[in-house]
Amino acid sequence: MTKREEKRNLESIPVGSLGVIALEGCKTLGEKVDYYLVKWRTERESEHKDSLAFAGYQRSSYLLDSKVPRFGSGEAKGMIKESVRGDDLFIMVDVCNYSITYTLCGHVNRMSPDDHYQNLKRISSAGCCKARRITVIMPFLYESRQHKRTSRESLDCAIALQELVKMGVDNIITFDAHDARVQNAIPLHGFETVQPAYQFIKGLLRHKKGLTIDSDHMM
C-alpha cells in the first residue's frame, strides 16, 4: 500500500482513541466510513503516530460492537460490548430507514424515526459516562420539519436536541437541516449542518448520462 507523507504541521493531538458505532439501519454506511478511515490512516506517514498521545490511532477497524436487544414486552436496551473509556466516540444513525423490523407479540413492526431515535438515546446513555467526547452523525435530522411552533404544537426537534446534549452528546452533525436555526435550542454545543448540493449535482452528472444543465433543459 502506498504511503503518503503528512506534511502538515500537527499542532494538536487526538481527543481520544477513535470509536465509531453504526446503529441498526446505518451499518452499510458505517462500514464504508470505517473502510475509508482505516485506509487513510494506514497510508499517512507521521513521526507522531507511535507516540503515547496517538495510542490507538491506527487500527484494523474503528467500528465498535453494539446492539439493542428487545425484551418480550417490546422494550429495548442499549449495549456497547467494548470499552469506550476515553474514546472520541461517533454514533451514526439513520432515522428514516424503514427497512429495519422487530417482532412484538408475534407481529412484525417496522422501525419508525421515533424507534431509531430511542435507540440512539439508549446507546448514548450506555457510553456517556465513559467516552471523552460523543458526536452524533444523523444524515436526516430527527423531527427537523417540526422546527417551529405556529399554534399549540410541540417543538420536537428542539426537545430532541436538548435531550441529547443533556445525556452527554457534545456535537451533532447532520445534512441539509430543514432550518439550521434550530441549533438555537443548544447554543452552547456543537451543531453542524452540511449542505450536500454539490454532491447531489456531482452524483447526477456521474450517473445520468446526457444530462445538460442550461436554461433550455432545466427548470
Which sequence ranges carry the predicted segments?
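PRPP-associated nucleotide enzymes
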Residues: 1-219
